[in-house]
Amino acid sequence: MSLAIAGTGWITPLGSGVDAVWHKLLDGHEAAATKISEQFRTRFYSVFRVPESALTTPASHPRLRRASLISRFAAAAGLEALRSAGITPDSQSAERIALVFAISNGGVIYTKRFYRDIVATGAQSASPLLFPETVFNAPASHVAAILGITGATYTLVGDGAVGILAIKMADDLMTNEELDYCLVVGAEEADWLLCDAYRRWRLLRLAPPIEPFAQLGRGMILSEGAGAVLLARVGRRRRADAKDDPVLIERTHPGGYYRKRAEAEEILKRILCDLSQTEIDFVISSANGTFIDLAECRALKQVTPNALVYTAKPALGESVGAAGLWQVVLAAQALRCGELPPLLRAEPTIPLRISASRIPVTTARHAIVLSCGVNQQAAGLRLRKAD
């Protein structure tokens, strides 16, 4: 089934709003890193945080007064996606909107606080206010309540590829004729504990920049934020966005799992082969400065050597749970606007079609979103700009 992207939402370290963030990427902006530390710890890590100004709209909602950052990011992105599609759920339409939430690390900040109190002073100190925020489906619950969505709600847990897998799930859900739309949201919050874990797995670098497709992967920088995509059946797009050429999700690929890093390249090749049955104009990659870059570079060079390649992670960081949705928003914007941003921090010797300056793609019709997570998942999808 081909689904139309009816609306998108973006909360990133470069701010909020799809158009605003898009223009910053086109201008070559790069998020500013913030140093974070932990009590009684001497090690500092760099992260790309979302500016407070990006969360002004939904933060006043009563349900979000004590909610975790990840829930606030998700609500803001979901609200923007609905607004961009001209949709305000009411008692009747809310039942015909499904929600699929993509998550990876979850609400780490509140979970850490909850268990720290227990360890410090005993089980009697466990906060009933914090506990609901420790479960993976807490952000989905907040988003559904705030946006007024009463249809089916699901939470999908995975790694950096989980956003693409969530869209695959939405594609399956939309075969139900009782649904008109499906809102797919992915979100992530950055914390010292996550940075320390990824460093121990030799996936993190202590300070920017992220160097994509480097021969020696020096690691990623974690970031936070959310992305949202509102999917509709072709023909159900509102007049509010009728002036734009619709972007369709032409095919979703379930991807696969790799046990060893050396196997990632073969899975990525298989995904690209299945999705490139038509001419592909550009690929939005998930290269983030880790082993993923080399695997994707080899797969892209072999299967789609003529396609332009771009990754936003040098500018935005690795947002894990939100990363896949960010890639889809990027691909849709590039097809609509006919332009790709400059690839930052890339060496000119990379054996792919890349550009260090913004490049027009006005005739582009097909794009692939390729997503490989660091925890053994890979997936992809193909977008098409409708005639």
Task: Report residues per predicted region.
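Conserved "HGTGT" condensation-loop signature of ketosynthase/thiolase-family condensing enzymes
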Residues: 1-152, 164, 172-176, 187, ...
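Alpha-to-beta junction loops
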Residues: 178-180
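Short beta-strand-to-loop elements that line the ligand-binding cleft
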Residues: 154-156
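Catalytic nucleophile serine of serine hydrolases
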Residues: 160-162
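Internal active-site segments that recognize and position negatively charged phosphoryl groups
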Residues: 169
